[in-house]
Structure formats: C-alpha cells, structure tokens
C-alpha cells in the first residue's frame, strides 16, 4: 500500500486499472517488478489462465449462467464442453501475455510459493495469489510488505466479474481401505476440520479459514487484516466456486492446458492455434 500511496494510485479493480498501475510502477527503483503471479508451466499457469477467464465472465466448462457473476454448479443435465474457444479465453490469454511485460524475469519458474516469496521480499508491488500464503509477509516483521499490504478480489475483465475463487483441500477416504479403519480415519478428518485445528493452522501461518466461528475470533482477527477483507469480499458476493469447477478430470485438464498456454505466453505460438489445442485436449477428458 505504501508504493500505491507514493504514486497516488487507486487499488486496481479491473485489468485495465492493473495495467495502468503496472505502467506507473515499472520505473520505481524500490522494486524489481510491478507484479508477480504464478506462471510456471502446468498447473500454476493454467490456474492463472482459468481464473483470468472467470474474470472475463466464463468458467473453463459450459456451466449454465444464472445472472450477475453466478453460474449453476449442477451439471447433471448438461453435456459438458470446454470453454477454451470463448471470447473470455482469448481475452484472458492476451491479458496474461501483457502482464508478462511487468513481471519478474524468472516468471516462468514461479509457482505459487515463488510468487509470494518474491512479493514478501519487497521485489514486487503486487501479487496475485492465494490468501493461505500471506503469512510469508503478514507474520514476518522482516518483510518489506509487513503491515503494508491491502487485499482485493482479482481484477475484473468484465464489469460484474471482479471475483476470486474459493481455494482449499478435499479430504477423502480411499476406496480400498480396510473397513475397520474407516472410523479411525473419519475421527481424524473431523479433527482436521474442527474449529480448534483451524485456529491452530491460522496461528501457525495459514491465513484462511472456512469456519465462521474461527474467523470471528478476536485473537484471529488481530493477526492480520486479511480476515476482515476476505469477510468483506464474501459479503459482497465476490468469492465464487465455479471458476475451478471440481470435475474428476480437473487435474488432467489443467495440466494439459498449462503446458499448451505456456507456448503462447512464453514461446509466442499463435493464440488461436494454442486455444484450439487447449479445447481439443480438455474435451477428451469431458467425453
């Protein structure tokens, strides 16, 4: 926030705002790059891509649009098709390519961890990443970003879509586990998601919580402003589920797309050819 104040910049609400801020900040001697974001080949880059698609108004598959920034998560009556030939897909890819001009030289090696570490070292003025990694600067007094960071939903490509996705982990039981072990496993799963454990995770660095009672704990709120900001985003309906719709073949789709879109972003392959390849690759996992 200190660098934004230095240049009298408003927090970017749209991708155009973001590019403007990057252009202003690119000459600042205090930082190496205006922004850092995950762009490593495979899952990190593909995730950045499909989240940008969401900011341009489309999920990566053809969920039914309801209105505003809402898509129907019920796919039982839908013949699923990939959305990588949509206008949103083209716009998202072009935006990410523009963003490379304001990003670290080693951007193509940045997964989520490297991205936030770069920001926490004061090398970039902004970062696009998950809140769970904010401990690298929120709880680190040696970080130049300590107590100098503001939080926003991801910037909008289309006006209604200044939104960010829900992250998290899925806990399950393997189908081949011995039946007598299931009660023990279930007991541990319940412990892992209990308010007591969630608070423990937060106190040891995971600055996110799916449990309202924990988020509203004064001790938790005092750790970082991030909880108030995420709570505000949720109340404003800017936290969405559909951007990373959890299909069984999601990981396969994302890994393939992340390799293909890399060729456009970093190797200058033709965009239409790249997106046709993404569409074909994703569709084979949907058939």
Model-derived regions: residue spans:
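Bilobed periplasmic-binding protein-like "clamshell/Venus-flytrap" ligand-binding domains
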Residues: 27-39, 194-205, 284-287
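Short helix-initiation/N-cap motifs at beta->coil->alpha
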Residues: 15-20, 107-121
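Extracytoplasmic/periplasmic substrate-recognition and gating elements
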Residues: 6-7, 80, 101-102, 139-209, ...
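Paired acidic/hydrophobic, glycine-rich loop segments that form the ligand-binding mouth/hinge
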Residues: 125-130
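C-terminal capping/gating helix-and-loop segments adjacent to ligand/active sites or protein-protein/ligand interfaces
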Residues: 164-165, 210-214, 228-286
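Periplasmic solute-binding protein
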Residues: 1-19, 39-77, 165-174, 253-262
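Glycine-centered hinge/linker elements that transmit conformational signals in sensory
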Residues: 22-24, 63-108
